[in-house]
Amino acid sequence: MQIQFIRAVQFSLLIKLDGRLREFNFRKIRNSEVETFSVNVCNERGDRIFFDMKKQDSSWDFTPSNLPGWIEQNKKVIRQAVEDELPNW
């Protein structure tokens, strides 16, 4: 009997957006043909915002598309933070 271990990738990043430091939690979804992360972050009221990031053609796409403006306006910063963190995993 052979045991196979599959690493669960999960990390948090503090990213400064619009003058506020926000904690983004990332969890890599296994069993996916496309590299995908489930992401959650709190807004100003403490409500959790959930979305997915999928790697398509060397760029990260965000789903759903109806995200708050402060996420929409800072997608480039979030993408870069993820790209900087991934080599550590």
How does the language model describe each region?
Residues 2, 23, 33-35, 44, ...:
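Glutamate identity and glutamate-enriched acidic tracts
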Residues 1-32:
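Negatively charged, low-complexity tracts enriched in Asp/Glu with abundant Ser/Thr
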Residues 8, 14, 27-29, 40, ...:
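Generic signature of intrinsically disordered, low-complexity segments enriched in small/polar residues
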Residues 47-89:
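Acidic, low-complexity intrinsically disordered segments
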